[in-house]
Amino acid sequence: MKKIITTTLILLAASFLPAQEGTVPADLLIDIRWQDGDTRTIFSHPVTQVYGQREDSKLYQNVGEVTNVGYYSLNQVLENIGSSWKRQKIDNETVQTTVDSLRKVAAGGYVYLYIERFLENRANLQYFFIIIRDKNDKTLYSKYFQYQAPNVTATRSTWWNYIVTEIPIELEYPFYVYVNDKQSQHLSDFKFRIDAVELKDVEVISVDEVME
C-alpha cells in the first residue's frame, strides 16, 4: 500500500513539473552545450558546470555527446499546485494531505538528467547515477538509475535518455549534482552547482499559502 501511495504522489507531482519523464524533455535541456564555468538559468535556478566539458576539439560543436541537469524545487511544485487547486477549489484537507506527503517523498525537489551518447549502449540509464553533495562537498544522497532504453535523436547521430528523479531529503543552496557514468574511466564525470532561484528565494510554503 505504501508503495502505491508513493507512486501516486510521484505521478501527481509530475503533472505539475515543467517536463515529465517519458516525454520529450524541455528544449533548454537538449540545446545546452557547456564549457566549464558556464552558468545557465534552468527552471529559474542558476546552474553552473564545474567540470565535465568536452575535449577541446569538440568544444564548440553543436552535435555530439551531451550531459545536462536541471532542478525544480518542491516549493516550485507547491506553487503550481496552489495555483491550479485554487482554481479548482480543492478542499483544505486534500491539500494538507498532499503537501505533507509530497514533503516526505520529495523534500529536496526534483533533479532532471538529460544525456546524449554516440552509442546506444552508452545511453542506457542503468549505467548512470547521481550524487548530491552540499556546499562543502559532503555527500547527502545518491541515486542509481535502473534500466531505461534510450531513444535515437531526430538526426540519428546520437541516442538520448532522460529522467526526472525526486530527492527525498531537504537541500540547502548551493548544492552540487554529480553525474557519473559507470562505463567511463573517471572517478567522477560531471559536476554541476545549483543555486537558489533567481530574483527571489522562495520560502517554505505553508498549506495556507498554497490555498491563498
Residue ranges and their predicted role:
Residues 4-17:
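Sec-dependent N-terminal signal peptides
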Residues 20-173, 180-212:
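Conserved functional micro-motifs across diverse proteins
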